[in-house]
């Protein structure tokens, strides 16, 4: 009798162990901010499997949508180990969104903690993950710096921060340094007082207008040809290489063929570029897709068409397309 009890108990323990280890199908309701990538990480599965199980043709999901997922929740796997860090060094491919997810924070918390005015990051930049905010400089340093005529950009700086420090405005700083966007780089030397350099270009520049239609800082012909050369490259969430791109990774890759910009999100590009009424070749067009606000972007190539990394890979689409037309937010210039 004793032997039978032990055997039965063992069977129950083994059975419950096997049952606990098995991945089970479950229904989840999509919450605000969710993406297929988030869910695939959380439930230890893949985007392809989720799309296949739910007959999805794209990566777009909606708040309140019910999805069937085969997998196990991994939400508490790494939160405790990552939360002990107080700083983080930005790596290639990082974004505020990725870092905030990794350390259980919000993008706004990260930006406030590091005095960031936009979502742009630079490789090698050190971000604070805990501690007091670095929103403004002390009044004493503001007074002592007023006699300085140049300033070398440090990690975490922004035009807004520098303008506040030297008692000037972002517009004046940009004019003084001939800047066409709010993007600045570590070790860049900026004039904080003096004469404007914005009008130093020769007046007759019509011979080069065909290659610089929308921006004086980018060769538009090269931008478009570099982008078109990538048509057919597959879609990959967070991808920044020719093995696969997401929409902002594609833009980052093409821009870095000519200049040096940090990896950021579509929202980051939206907030750092200059608004224009209508796009010219080489400008950037923005859309709202799986969440409110800018969440997808592409490069305008003329004839009401744009090139972008969509769910089917890098492709050329029309702004009149029945999907894109109602989701169009506007155009920006680098």
From Swiss-Prot:
Domain (LysM): residue spans on this chain: 26-69, 86-129, 149-192
Active-site residues (renumbered): 247 (nucleophile), 296 (proton acceptor), 308
NlpC/P60 domain location: 217-334
One MF annotation (Gene Ontology) recorded for this entry: cysteine-type peptidase activity
GO cellular component terms attached to this protein's record: extracellular region
Catalytic activity, EC: 3.4.-.-
UniProt KW rRNA-binding keyword: no
Signal peptide: 1-25
Compositionally biased residues, Low complexity: 72-87, 132-153
Region annotation Disordered: where it falls in the sequence: 70-89, 131-153, 195-215
Annotated domain remarks: The N-terminal domain contains LysM domains that are thought to be involved in peptidoglycan binding, while the C-terminal domain is endowed with the catalytic activity.
Similarity remark: Belongs to the peptidase C40 family.
Designated name of the protein: Probable peptidoglycan endopeptidase LytE
Organism field: Bacillus subtilis (strain 168)
Gene: lytE
């Amino acid at each position: 009798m004793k032997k039978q009890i032990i055997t039965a108990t063992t069977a129950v323990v083994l059975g419950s162990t096997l049952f606990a280890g098995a991945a089970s199908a479950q229904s989840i309701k999509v919450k605000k901010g969710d993406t297929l990538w988030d869910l695939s990480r959380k439930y230890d599965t893949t985007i392809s499997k989720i799309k296949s199980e739910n007959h999805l043709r794209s990566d777009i999901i909606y708040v309140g949508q019910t999805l069937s997922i085969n997998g196990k929740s991994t939400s508490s796997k790494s939160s405790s180990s990552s939360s002990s860090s107080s700083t983080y060094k930005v790596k290639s491919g990082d974004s505020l969104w990725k870092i905030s997810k990794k350390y259980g924070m919000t993008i706004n918390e990260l930006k406030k903690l590091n005095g960031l005015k936009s979502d742009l990051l630079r490789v090698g930049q050190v971000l604070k993950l805990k501690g007091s905010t670095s929103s403004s400089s002390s009044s004493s340093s503001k007074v002592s710096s007023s006699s300085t005529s140049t300033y070398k950009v440090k990690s975490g700086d922004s035009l807004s921060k520098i303008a506040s420090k030297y008692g000037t405005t972002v517009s004046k700083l940009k004019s003084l340094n001939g800047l066409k966007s709010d993007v600045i780089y570590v070790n860049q030397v900026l004039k904080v007082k003096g004469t404007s350099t914005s009008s130093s270009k020769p007046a007759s520049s019509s011979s080069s207008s065909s290659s610089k239609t929308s921006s004086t800082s980018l060769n538009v012909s090269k931008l478009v040809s570099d982008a078109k050369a990538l048509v057919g490259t597959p879609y990959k969430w967070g991808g920044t290489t020719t093995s696969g791109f997401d929409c902002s990774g594609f833009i980052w890759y093409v821009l870095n063929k000519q200049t040096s910009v940090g990896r950021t999100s579509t929202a980051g590009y939206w907030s750092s570029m200059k608004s224009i009424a209508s796009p010219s070749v080489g400008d950037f067009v923005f859309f709202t897709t799986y969440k409110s606000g800018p969440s997808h972007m592409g490069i305008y190539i003329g004839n009401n068409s744009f090139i972008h990394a969509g769910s089917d890979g890098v492709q050329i689409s029309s702004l009149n397309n029945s999907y894109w037309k109602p989701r169009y937010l506007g155009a920006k210039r680098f």
